[in-house]
Amino acid sequence: MRKNRAEKRDVLADPIYNSKLVTRAINKIMLDGKRGIAQSIIYDAFNIIKEKTNKEPIEVFNKAIENIKPHLELKVRRIGGANYQVPVEVSAERQITLALRWLINYARLRNEKVMTIKLANEIIDASNNIGGSVKKREDTHKMAEANKAFAHYRW
């Protein structure tokens, strides 16, 4: 067990869009430390978004993240030999973390051929409140609503 909690490191804003959120997306999409490939995937996806929507890609991306962010999640709590799924509020930092995780996971599951197209389409869908990642948020909220009776077990 740690003596102290590890300090959160601050990420640097990305060079093109000057956004920490884009840097976090790059870090999340990166595999085996290949940052260059991850950056090209994100930036190419943003170019596709610009072509398809004629809007600023960073605005579409931010709107998508806002639409995916969960406000409640379930945590399992063991009480008296029974496991309860207790709905808890999600901190702002964790909302962004979950939104990015879901966005990238559901982009990877799409049927298009190339990751840039998959990611661009998932971001566009999420900004329009459709797509797998938005469905995941809605399912999470539904489960939290269904288990509202156990909310008094919060800690």
Curated annotation (Swiss-Prot):
Any Gene Ontology CC annotation: small ribosomal subunit
Keywords on record: Ribonucleoprotein, Ribosomal protein, RNA-binding, rRNA-binding, tRNA-binding
GO molecular function list: rRNA binding; structural constituent of ribosome; tRNA binding
Superkingdom per UniProt: Bacteria
Any one biological process term the GO annotation gives: translation
UniProt cross-references to InterPro entries, sorted A to Z: Ribosomal_uS7, Ribosomal_uS7_bac/org-type, Ribosomal_uS7_CS, Ribosomal_uS7_dom, Ribosomal_uS7_dom_sf
Pfam family, one: Ribosomal_S7
Residues of the signal peptide: none
Keyword Ribosomal protein attributed: yes
Role of this protein: One of the primary rRNA binding proteins, it binds directly to 16S rRNA where it nucleates assembly of the head domain of the 30S subunit. Is located at the subunit interface close to the decoding center, probably blocks exit of the E-site tRNA.
Subunit structure as annotated in this protein's UniProt entry: Part of the 30S ribosomal subunit. Contacts proteins S9 and S11.
Family that this chain belongs to: Belongs to the universal ribosomal protein uS7 family.
Name this protein carries in UniProt: Small ribosomal subunit protein uS7
